[in-house]
Amino acid sequence: MVGPSRLAGGGLLLLLLALLPVALDGKPAPPSQALHKAPAGGTKASQIMQVLLPESKKSWAARDRMVGPYNPAGGGGGHPSSCFGHKIDRISHSSGMGCGRRPNAPAGGTKASQIMQVLLPESKKSRAARDRMVGPDNRAGGGGGGGGGDSSRQQELAKKDQHNNCFGRRIDRISHSTDLGCRRRPNPPPAPTAAPLAVAQFNSKSSQVA
């Protein structure tokens, strides 16, 4: 026989379960924190991962130089990238052994070139701005956007900087401090030999004796 305390506890539990939808009122709980939105272009790590991890076999074959496009069995017959209806592996492509030939390079470049484009700066101007050891290029007659000033003054500056450059490029600090490169410190003048000094002393002694 069930006691009255157990019956009261069970009834209270049923009442709480019945009132729970009314308390929530059918509305979901608000999110605790707003989700952080990633940038439109993505970070460098995400771009590199997109290059290294293609989504499908089609993109894999387009990005990998060693693997040709996938051809199902029975399609294409003697296609250069297939061998008896099967996809040629990387060993056949790299060694030249087999019935298929090496496919042409993709238009977008290899994986290494795509990763280097992500990591390296876009232009020489941004590279010179980020590198403290290399200054901006000084070119005679430059200044197409703002008039460029006097051309003779630009030529004088270019002649002045001829001793500070190496094959048209500015020498870095290492070349100046260690004398490595095409600009070297001039050799010191040779020291006077002892022969003229001895002749002068002999002449002075002979004049005193006379």
UniProtKB/Swiss-Prot annotation:
Keyword Signal among UniProt keywords: yes
Assigned protein family: Belongs to the natriuretic peptide family.
GO biological process, one term: vasodilation
Disulfide bond sites: 83-99, 166-182
Organism the protein comes from: Ophiophagus hannah (King cobra)
Annotated Basic and acidic residues bias: 122-134, 156-176
Signal among keywords: yes
Name this protein carries in UniProt: Natriuretic peptide Oh-NP
Biased amino acid composition, Gly residues: 140-150
InterPro entries in the cross-refs: Natr_peptide (IPR000663), Natr_peptide_CS (IPR030480)
Tissue occurrence: Expressed by the venom gland.
Record localization: Secreted
UniProt-annotated stretches for the region Natriuretic peptide domain 2: 166-182
Signal sequence interval, chain numbering: 1-26
Function, as annotated: Natriuretic peptide that dose-dependently induces the rapid relaxation of rat aortic strips phenylephrine-precontracted. Acts by stimulating cGMP production in a dose-dependent manner (by probably activating NPR1 and/or NPR2). May also show potent hypotensive effects.
UniProt main location, coarse: secreted
GO cellular component, one term: extracellular region
One Gene Ontology term of the molecular function aspect: hormone activity
Region (Natriuretic peptide domain 1), start-end ranges: 83-99
Region Disordered, residue ranges: 122-210
Entry keyword set: Disulfide bond, Hypotensive agent, Secreted, Signal, Toxin, Vasoactive, Vasodilator
Biased composition (Polar residues): 201-210
